[in-house]
Amino acid sequence: MNSKLSLSTKLSQSGKTQLAEYFATPPFKVITLPSYDDAWVNGLNAMQMSSSPGVLAGDVLEIDISLAKLTALSLNTQAFTRVQAMNEGESAMQTTHISRAENSRLFYLPHPLVLHKDSIFKQQTQIEMREQSELIYGEIVAIGRVLNDERFAFRQFSSHLKIYALQNDGKKRPLVSDCIQWLPSKMNLTALSQMENYSHQGSLTYLNLAKSNAEIKQQVQALQQQFTDEKALLIGISLLNECGLMVRVLGHRAETIQQLFEKIGKQLKVL
């Protein structure tokens, strides 16, 4: 099935973020939620939903999100995305494109992906940011239905994340390029520096084009100190080359990583 979700934001006369345009084909749907206590006081809180039991063979999913100047969007999803079993030669893919105007802010944390036996899933995410914009973006993936004894039983998983700063001359300046490529039949994914004995991996990327590298470095040091004694998760926090940081996590439960990213995201919103 070919499915598309497209949404954009606008600023109301009272300075609140609203949906400007919204289009979705099954199984996608988005609902806006009541305002809540958040550092982005004029932001919009929304939930991305799906009526499908998961990602099926042959699915081509397209997500397009555009934020207008001075708007802020916090977008979560309803539930885990399960990539269902597929026959040999079948696959599914998702492309996500996010464009950000000046002084816009986005928090986007989809629920974890669960890779079922024999599945192949490929996703590509491209994000474009303009001056003074802010991004908190997370991805979490499970290596299979671990409680069913499925560990690395999928055929392939790839995830490519590219983030650019759009300059006034129209050129793109690369900020982040991150790639995950898992082929269990050809790779020892339990080796040292790979997944080892962990079953879930998460990455959280934070970029703020209004902050200096010195300010971001202080945030990195504060987060590193905060999670020094964490036992349930293996956490690495790194300073990006420009205007941002990345948190990489290995764990045994998706909910633990999800809650960690929500906690960090809430902190980053107020810094």
Can you annotate each of these PLM segments?
Residues 89-153:
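Internal, conserved structured core segments that host functional sites
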Residues 1, 57, 90, 117-119, ...:
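Solvent-exposed loop and beta-edge segments used for protein-protein assembly and interaction
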Residues 72-74, 105-106, 134-135, 202-203, ...:
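Structural motif
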Residues 2-6, 43, 60-62, 93-95, ...:
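Broad gene-expression machinery/nucleic-acid interaction feature
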Residues 1-102, 106-112, 117:
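N-terminal, charged/glycine-rich beta-strand/loop interface patches
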Residues 141, 146-266, 271:
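A structural signal for small-residue-enriched, beta-sheet-centric alpha/beta enzyme cores
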Residues 67-69, 77-79, 100-102, 110-112, ...:
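Short, structured patches in soluble enzyme cores that scaffold and shape functional sites
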Residues 28-32, 84-89, 118-120, 146-150, ...:
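A short, polar/proline- and glycine-enriched secondary-structure boundary/capping micro-motif
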